[in-house]
Amino acid sequence: MERRYSTLKPLNVRNLEEYNVKVSLKDRMPVIVIIIDELADLMMSGNKKEVESAITRIAQKARAVGLHMILATQRPSVDVITGLIKANVPSRVAFTVASQVDSRTVLDTIGAEDLLGRGDMLYFPTGAMASTRIQ
């Protein structure tokens, strides 16, 4: 992430899209998607504060330089999806969860406990007032 910011700075651009317009085809940088498949395992495997700090930093700064993050967990508890992570990852998707508590942990609202499975989900985009059911 920092290397990408250093690359953008000499061209006086603020994001990856502007950079890719200014450079030749061979020098363009791709968008990178970082997928953390089991956040609970990562949070429990080492220094929780360090993991939380790294995720927060990526969530705050990385989008401008073409890095996007998907966090997934089978266990949506407040020990895994901390308040700091929730505050910095504003767009959320929830598939079927076991309880209203789990739904609130992910989406800050109930409803995910009533989903049907097979791709049925609630999507809560940045800035929205309510989640949208999609499949």
Task: Enumerate the predicted regions with their spans.
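P-loop NTPase motor-domain active sites and their immediate coupling elements
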Residues: 1-135
